Amino acid sequence: MKIDESLVKRLETLSMVEIEDKASMAKDLAEIVEFVEMLNELDTSNVDATFSTLDNSTYLREDEPIKNNVIEEILEHAPKAKDGFFIVPKIIE
């Protein structure tokens, strides 16, 4: 793919972003495309499409509801609390 200033102008129009230095942008985009083309040359024939480094090592637990009193424990440390809520000073009149 050839990256030149006319392509940069088209991208500028499509993205609705003003590009001041079109020549520099064309050079940068050409380098990016060249890098991606290098990646396309990699031999991935021996790599499974579903390859993962995790090997299902994520521990899954049973999702069981547990009754606890976390709210009460937290509110015990609050300066003021009532009916399960923090009581704070009024700051807006």
From Swiss-Prot:
Reaction equation(s) it catalyzes: L-glutamyl-tRNA(Gln) + L-glutamine + ATP + H2O = L-glutaminyl-tRNA(Gln) + L-glutamate + ADP + phosphate + H(+); L-aspartyl-tRNA(Asn) + L-glutamine + ATP + H2O = L-asparaginyl-tRNA(Asn) + L-glutamate + ADP + phosphate + 2 H(+)
Ranges in coiled-coil conformation: none
Enzyme Commission number: 6.3.5.-
Keywords noted in UniProt: ATP-binding, Ligase, Nucleotide-binding, Protein biosynthesis
GO molecular function term, any single one: asparaginyl-tRNA synthase (glutamine-hydrolyzing) activity
Quaternary structure and interacting proteins, as annotated: Heterotrimer of A, B and C subunits.
Functional summary from the UniProt entry: Allows the formation of correctly charged Asn-tRNA(Asn) or Gln-tRNA(Gln) through the transamidation of misacylated Asp-tRNA(Asn) or Glu-tRNA(Gln) in organisms which lack either or both of asparaginyl-tRNA or glutaminyl-tRNA synthetases. The reaction takes place in the presence of glutamine and ATP through an activated phospho-Asp-tRNA(Asn) or phospho-Glu-tRNA(Gln).
Protein name, UniProt field: Aspartyl/glutamyl-tRNA(Asn/Gln) amidotransferase subunit C
Species whose genome carries this gene: Nautilia profundicola (strain ATCC BAA-1463 / DSM 18972 / AmH)
Gene field: gatC
